Amino acid sequence: MTLDKLSVGKCGTITAVGGEGALRLRLLDMGLIPKTKVNVVKVAPMGDPIEIRVRGYELTIRKEDAANIEIQEEK
């Protein structure tokens, strides 16, 4: 499952970060690295962008970028 598919209020753990070159490096620099827990806080009215909580802070990313982040949803 990818981060863009996770519902509001749900949590998951990052398993892999995809993307090419600068995009991948930017995601990693923002703290989106494997084995990190993420929580979807809210989604904009039109569905893009999404706000997530990672490492104790809120981060807003485009849905297109979130599609490059593989996660394992916590049950």
Spans of model-derived segments:
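Absolute protein N-terminus
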Residues: 1-2
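A structural micro-motif recognizing beta-strand termini
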Residues: 17-20
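Short alpha-helix capping/helix-loop boundary micro-motifs
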Residues: 23-26
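C-terminal structural segments of small proteins and small subunits
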Residues: 44-75
